[in-house]
C-alpha cells in the first residue's frame, strides 16, 4: 500500500511539533488555532470542543480540532491549569503575500510556571522554581515571570528543597541535574509538580550578578535559560537575582503553615478563615501579594520588626490621614504586572492609561505620608518616585477614552503629533466636503432625492433611483447598476475619497507607530516602576495591619532576650473573628525563663488546640511586624516554629498517621534550637496506647534535656503529668471544666496543674452516640481506671534498665530475647533518615522488609 502523501502545510506542522513533543501545539491557520493528531484528540476531550478530521476521505484521516484565535486564551488557561504546556505557532507573514506555505514559528511556550496573560487574572504570585545539585548541596531559585521577582538560595538536603517548593506553592519545577527516581516520584506524585529539564545556563551578568554563590548562580542561570527558551524574547522586567537564606526568616514547614491556617483554611482550601483573610485590608494587588509574603516569611531580625511596628503606630495615631491614604491607594493599579506586560510587548492603551492614573496618585500618597511628619516614614518617602516625566508622557500621548486594541485607531491624543493631526483634519473636513458636494449636485441636477452613500465595494457614490436617471449630469460616471437604482461617481468625489482613504490609512499606521514608540519609552522606566511598586506595596500592607489592629483591639508586642513568654489575656485572632469578641474566652500564656515545656491536658473539644495555635499565631503576627490580639504581649524572637497538629492529615500519599507524626516529630527534634517554638498536639495517638505513651514521654524528656525549645505538648496520656516531678523545666496546665448535676461544661480556660479526667464519654455524648453505648463505655472506663500506670523518671529507667512505663497489665513478649544479629540491621543503621523524605524512608523500609 502506497504511503499517503503529506501536504506541505502538514509537513510544516510535523516539523514544528517534533521540537515540542511535551506541549500542545496551537497552529495558527487564519482565524483559528488548529490542533492535529494526538493533540487534537486529547484537547477535544479536555476542552469539550468538536473533534473533526483533515482529509476525511483518506484511509487515515488526520484528527483535527480548533479554537478561534480571539478566544484562545480561555482554552489555553484550561490546559495550563491542568498542568500542560502549550506552544503557540503564529503566522509570521501575511498569507496574501506568502509564496507557497505561510511561514510559521513558535513564538511562546506557556507553562504552569510561566503564565503571564490569563483570562482570569489572579493577584497572587505564580512562582517557577529551579533546582540544582553539586555534591550533597542543593541550589534553589525561583521567579515570578509576571512580576519579575527573582531569588536564589542553597539548601542542605532534598527534604528542605521539597519544603521550600511547597511553601512557594509552585506548580512547575525546572530540574538542572540527574534526579533520582525516588526523588522524582516525590516531586511528581506527592507534590503534584510538572517537571521540566534544563541543563544549560543563560549567562547574564546583569541578572545573575556576583552576590550569589557558585551553586546559586548555576541554578539561577538554568532558570533564566528555561524562561528565555519558553518566552523567546528579552524580558526587561526581570529583576536581579537576590540571595536569601531560610534562616533569615521564621522557619516553618508547609505542614506547619497549613495547620495554622496562615494563608488559607486547611479544611476548605479557601482564603476565608485564614490569617491572611483576617489581616487583608490592602487596597492594591501588590500590597496583597506582599502581605502574603510577610505572613509566609516572618522576620527574625528584631530591628526590622520594630521598624514595621513604628510605621503601624504612626498610622494608628493618625486616623483621618490614614483613611485618606487608603482611599488614594484604591486608585493604584498593579504596577508590577503592568510593567511585565510592557516588557512582553503586550501592553495595550488601557494598560498605559492605568499606569498613568497610578502615577498621578503617587504625589497624593506622598503628600499624605509627609503630613504625618514622622521620621519612621523617611525611608518609604524616598522610595516613592512619582516619575513625573513618564506620567506627563502618558497623559499627553494616550487618549483617556482609547480602546484596548492597538489597531483600531483612537489611541493618540489630539495635539501630540502634528502629522497625525493633519491626517485627522483631512478625515474630518472630508466629511463636510462630501456634504457640500452632495448639496451642490442636488441643486445643479434638480434630483431632489440625490444623496451620497458609502460601502466598502464601491466607496463613496451618488445614489440615483431609476425614475431620475434622465436627470443625471454628463460628468457622472456609472459605478454599479441595481434593480431600482444606479450608483454614480464624479471626478471631484473620487478625489475627495482618495484623500480621505489615504489619510485614514496613513493615520492608522502612524498612530500604531506612535503607540509603539511610547511603549518603548515606558519600557525604559521599568526598574524605577518596580521600585515604586515595592514602596507602594509596603505602605499598603502597613496601613492594612494598622486597620486590623485598630478594628480588633490588638496591642503592640515587645521583645525580650530572657527567653520569656508573657501574653496577658491573649486570643486566637481568627477564631475570635469568626466567633465574635463576646463569645471568645481569652487565655493568658506564661513561660518564665526557666520554663520550657507546658504539658497540656484536658477534654477533647475543650480548646487545647486553639490555645496552642493561639501562641503560634501570636508569634507569627508579632514577627511579621503586626500587632497581636491580647492585653499585652512580651515574647522572645523565635527562629522557627515546629508543629504536629493532625487535624489536616492527608493520607493519600500512603503515609499512616503514626508515620506522619514521627516524621514531623523528627524534624522538630533534629532541627529545633533553644530559640524555637514546638507545638505537639496529641503526639503518639497513631499507635498502640503504651507505645504512644512511651514515645511521648521519651520525646518530652529529649526536648527537655537536649533541645531546650519552648514547647506546648497536649496529650490525652494523663499519666505523663507525673513528669513534672522529675523535669524541672516542665509545668502542667489543663483546661478547666465545671461539673454540676451530672453535666459537664468546658470553660475553655487554661489553668495551672494537671487535669483529673478526660471526659471522653461526655464528648461522645455531645456527638450524639446512643445512650446504651455510652452506658457500656462508662462501665468499661470504671474497670480500666482500677488498673495502675506509674510514670518513672528517666534516671530510674537508666539505672534499673526497666521501661519508662511500668504497668500491671499483660506485658508484651520481648522482641530482643535470644537475639541473633541480622545483616539487614546494619543496612538499617546505615540509612541516613535525617536527609531522606518520608517517601524515601518508606521505600527503603519496604526494600529491607523484602530481605527479612
Curated annotation (Swiss-Prot):
One of its GO terms (cellular component) is cytosol. GO terms for biological process: mismatch repair. GO terms for molecular function: ATP binding; ATP-dependent DNA damage sensor activity; damaged DNA binding; mismatched DNA binding. Keywords: ATP-binding, DNA damage, DNA repair, DNA-binding, Nucleotide-binding. Belongs to the DNA mismatch repair MutS family. PANTHER family: DNA MISMATCH REPAIR PROTEIN MSH1, MITOCHONDRIAL, DNA MISMATCH REPAIR PROTEIN MUTS FAMILY MEMBER. HAMAP family: MutS. ATP binds at residues 602-609. It comes from the Bacteria. This is DNA mismatch repair protein MutS. This protein is involved in the repair of mismatches in DNA. It is possible that it carries out the mismatch recognition step. This protein has a weak ATPase activity.
